[in-house]
Amino acid sequence: MTKKRTWKFWAGRTILGLLVIGGLWLTNLIWFRPFNINHFYDKVFIELAISDPELVTQLGIPVLYDIYKEDLSDASDKKGWEDFLKLKDDLAALQSYDFESQSKENKLNTKILSWYLRKQIEGEPFFYHGYPVNQMFGVQSNLPSLMESSHKLRDESDIEAYIIRLSKFGAKFDQVLEGLRIREEKGIIPPQFVIDRVISEMSGFIGKKGSNHINLEITNEDPVKSNILYTHFNSKLAQLEDLTDQEKKAYKIKVENEIRTTVFEAYGALILYFEALKSKATTEDGVWKLPDGNDFYQYQLSENTTTDYTPDKVHQIGLSEVARIKTEMWDLLTLEGYADTTKTLGEIIQKLNKEERFLYQNNDEGRKEVID
């Protein structure tokens, strides 16, 4: 064997070896237990991202963005339970790494992730305790927000993905409805004010308003062309110079048709569901009204404070803190000559806020004076 052939032989074997090692590392990272805990953290994030196309879009993750830009996240009950069971698998994998051999930073990361996973798993009895569609968030507001603020419209590929996503609104809303019906069967029903606001929000979105007979009457001449999904697309499309006017017109028609049929029909189905649900709703709005509501409240308290305080203890802390702060405020007001026992603390503060020396003009000069 000549020197040249010997070099090629060993170079080839080296490259092959590196490919095998790289393949083993990638295989372990994706399908099995990663070799070290840093790779495990990477695995958890990657798995989260690839299972949630909407999150990928919101984060604008390179490469992954283009792979998943036609998809919407799975909101089915089955997927929800799959994600929950994965939490248990992730915790078991995390616990398989030797804690004492980890760096100081990784020990902290492990403690935080372990606590989070344990706390989520503890919440299994309350898997359905929540209102997926409410006046603050839900598919009815999250999806339009995603399409308007996160879905890019840079070229024809993005445009096609936008239209495909619009065509999937119906399937997504059906998944959400599935979860809502399961909750309804379990007695987990939003209070009346939540239902009223959600119906009003969705009716406004499709340019209609609800009547006392559940029917919907049109309030805008063409609600599609005034809808954010259409107006946003139209404004972005106008900025693309690589498309002819004829091509732009064709895309606008496609978007208009998807909104008018798929999107608006999905919203209409959700509106009708909540209209029917109103007869079962009450004015009670505390979690105590839910099945095992007191236990759920305790769980939420633990999850959001990282303590084992009881609801009564937290309430007492609140009362004592309010009393302490009020006492300190009265002391300060007395010291400054503002104490007036014939008035409430709130009345004194309101009067204090109106004093000329505490007021500044709402202009550049006034703002400069505040800073100085």
Predicted feature residues:
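N-terminal secretory signal peptides that target proteins for export/translocation
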Residues: 1-4
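N-terminal maturation segment of proteins
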Residues: 6-372
